[in-house]
Design a protein with these regions (language model features):
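Extended ligand-binding regions for polar small-molecule ligands
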Residues: 23-42, 68-80, 146-172, 220-222, ...
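Bilobed "Venus flytrap"/periplasmic-binding protein-like clamshell domains
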Residues: 49-58, 63-84, 120, 139-199, ...
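Substrate-binding/active-site groove segments that recognize
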Residues: 335-359, 366-377, 423-424, 448
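Acidic, polar ligand-binding/catalytic clefts
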Residues: 57, 75, 86-157, 223-225, ...
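Export/targeting segments at the very N-terminus of extracytoplasmic proteins
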Residues: 284-331, 365-368, 382-386
Length: 473
């Protein structure tokens, strides 16, 4: 919503795809591998480079409040190291967020000193990486669905069904093995939808609750944590997915002193009893997505499709981006009104509409026209750089639509200063937004993105083929 103050599905049998921490965020990409550093070199540099899983569940911080499960443990380790410093020089943590499946490779290349994934993560022998003592032992995987739908008691019952998984999911090997067994019995495999890289495990769980995805698999601690936020989720605990695993931190094999220090720290560390207080308080207030393709909403979208396609085409946009924004703003209600001034399907303000030459936003056509034109204006004026891919470009446009383009540009500047990727909103610039303005804008962009992905999965059925023109003879 513009405020007055600021105007794949991939179904296949499983084939594996190849102080405050957030203020210390580091680079997304490192072009030259750094040398291996053990504890002496780390103390000399006064910086411990920590590669973290970029998901908000693992490493998020909101306006100085920890929501990531690794935050407290890493801060305690920082204090432990400084408490044992002989020269009195303090070590600072430099947080480097990466996708889960990139963490160990980055460590092996010397881009960080320590990996703290916050989830189960398998180490490959080729990486030459050592594990710490277990942070958590015997961690099972749970099958997650939504209450009211069919329960499962064994993995083979998933034959022919689809699981939504993030790349790097700990369930990958287990599904591969069960598919081999199903093939021997000539049964359909369990299909895997590798979700879009803009989604983290917490996003997938929210979309399962909404009914956009039907099933996923996550570690027990993640399931238990998010069950307090997403109460409609159902956990089929009796399904034996794989042998329980252990959670670790990871270091290079030749960083033996660092590993020894980590193990000594872990022997005495206890998770704070209030670790999730801020997490629950923040997330319980946030908007949660629902299925935008439920029967009634799908019927509304079908009626709105011509006008959305018309104005998206005029502005060179994907009409499903307009549809996703319209659903988030007004739930496809052209008569929606807001006391602050936003009006209609796109919830655009009169002042924003006037900036793009639309003086009356009461009709459906003019309302969508104003919204599409305003999005195009933001895109053209602030986010036209060829360095942005189209998904990230749209995310920046949405963030600017919500809180103003100048503010978003300022966040990109701050991200660049801290070594984050200023051309990536998801998991990079959004970290600056979380710190500066809280979760509101991040939740807004993520929600519209989820609706877009939900529509995009059904694009073929939402876009009837053009009528054939009879040839003249």
């Amino acid at each position: 919503m513009i405020r007055p103050s600021a105007l794949l599905m991939l179904c296949l049998t499983l084939l594996l795809p190849a102080a405050a921490l957030a203020r210390l965020d580091g680079p997304l990409e490192v072009t030259r591998p750094g040398k291996v550093r053990d504890l002496a070199e780390i103390r000399s540099s006064r910086t411990l480079r920590v590669l973290v899983n970029q998901s908000r569940n693992s490493s998020g911080e909101v306006q100085g409040q920890a929501i990531g499960v690794e935050y407290h443990r890493l801060r305690a380790f920082e204090q432990y190291l400084n408490g044992h410093a002989r020269d009195g020089q303090e070590i600072n943590l430099k947080i480097i967020p990466k996708a889960k499946d990139q963490l160990l490779g980055a460590l092996a290349r010397g881009e960080g000193d320590l990996v703290a994934p916050g989830e189960l993560l398998d180490v490959k022998a080729a990486h030459k990486i050592s594990t710490s003592d277990p942070i958590a032992s015997g961690v099972p995987l749970w099958l997650v669905g939504v209450k009211g739908e069919r329960r499962f008691t064994k993995l083979e019952q998933l034959s022919g069904r689809t699981l939504a998984l993030t790349t790097g999911s700990a369930a990958a090997d287990a599904i591969s093995q069960v598919n081999q067994k199903l093939a021997l019995h000539k049964q359909p495999p369990v299909k895997v939808e590798w979700v879009d890289p803009t989604l983290a495990v917490e996003d997938v769980l929210e979309m399962v609750q909404a009914g956009i995805f039907h099933l996923t698999i996550v570690e027990k601690p993640i399931a238990e944590r998010w069950s307090k936020i997403l109460p409609k989720l159902r956990f089929d605990k009796q399904v034996a997915i794989s042998e329980p695993g252990d959670e670790y931190w990871f270091v290079r094999q030749d960083a033996s002193m660092l590993r020894a220090s980590i193990d000594r720290f872990l022997k005495t560390y206890r998770t704070p009893s209030d670790q999730d207080v801020a997490f629950q308080r923040i997330y319980r207030r946030l908007y949660q997505v629902r299925n935008p393709l439920a029967r009634v909403d799908r019927q509304r979208l079908e009626k709105l499709r011509p006008v959305l396609q018309k104005h998206a085409r005029e502005q060179g946009m994907d009409w499903l981006n307009l549809a996703a924004l319209a659903f988030k703003e007004s739930a496809f209600d052209p008569g929606a009104r807001n006391s602050g001034g936003p009006t209609g399907l796109m919830q655009i303000t009169p002042s924003a509409a006037q900036r793009v030459g639309v003086n009356n936003i009461e009709s459906l056509d003019s309302n969508v026209q104003a919204g599409a034109r305003y999005l195009a204006l933001i895109r053209r004026k602030f986010f036209a750089s060829p360095k942005l891919n189209e998904r990230e470009r749209m995310a920046f446009v949405l963030a600017a639509y919500n809180m103003g383009p100048e503010r978003v540009q300022g966040m990109r500047t701050e991200a660049r200063r801290r070594g984050l990727n200023p051309n990536q909103w998801f998991f990079q610039v959004e970290r600056i937004a979380m710190e500066q303005v809280g979760m509101g804008a991040v939740s807004y962009v993520n929600s519209v993105n989820k609706y877009y992905l939900a529509f995009d999965r059904e694009r073929e059925s939402l876009e009837p083929p053009a009528p054939k023109i009879a040839s003249r003879k």
